[in-house]
Amino acid sequence: MSSAPARREKSPKPKAGGKAVFDWQDPLRFDDLLSEDERLVRDAARAYAQDKLMPRVLKAFREEHFDRAILNEMGALGFLGSTIDGYGCAGASYVAYGLVAREIERVDSGFRSAMSVQSSLVMFPIFAFGTEAQRKKYLPKLATGALAGCFGLTEPDVGSDVMGMKARARKVDGGYVLKGSKMWISNAPFADVMVVWAKLDEGGGDTIIG
């Protein structure tokens, strides 16, 4: 992940035997628990969110439009799929990923959701459950933002209840045929890669696949 200088001054730490100093921006002294690399990642995310994302929030809401270039920018900073090792990903800690998400969420939840869907709901399932060929085909381009991904789980009748979902997948030569309806799919309007949850009926029992 890229780094940037810190954007706020820390309150001074108390000297031995002195009075405790309260930092209203970090009342639990969370910053003291972070590694130097994690602080650099957080500061890079804070600078990006404040300088590049904040000016786009009003336009995004008024025009109901997501600027696709944001994923490319996040990819250049190493924010997409950051906890994955290899395949063009940063291999960062989950703490670092959480810090990035918090800084982007602070500016706009929609922008944070776009990053989280790409990273956690598209890239990680491909990394954890996909074939090596699928990992090599999709992950590097998803990591840079060249490809955008979406995640289809929620259905009109059962919401996000995995056990109750009605979408079905039927195995055919070369893949599966999907039948069913999904809704509220973040990133769907501009997605190139879609991870869709469905039930595969094999041997008389339902098997959930994505």
Language-model-derived ranges and their functions:
Residues D32-L53:
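Mature N-terminal segment immediately following signal peptide/propeptide cleavage
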Residues M1-D37:
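Intrinsic disorder at enzyme termini
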Residues A167-R170:
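A structural signal for short hydrophobic beta-strand segments in well-ordered beta-sheet cores
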Residues P55-L77:
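Short secondary-structure junction/hinge motifs that connect adjacent elements
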Residues A76-A148, S186-V193:
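Internal helix-loop-helix
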Residues G175, K179-G210:
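A short core secondary-structure module
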Residues F61, H65, C89, V158-S160:
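Conserved, non-catalytic sequence blocks in retroelement Pol enzymes and Pol-derived host proteins
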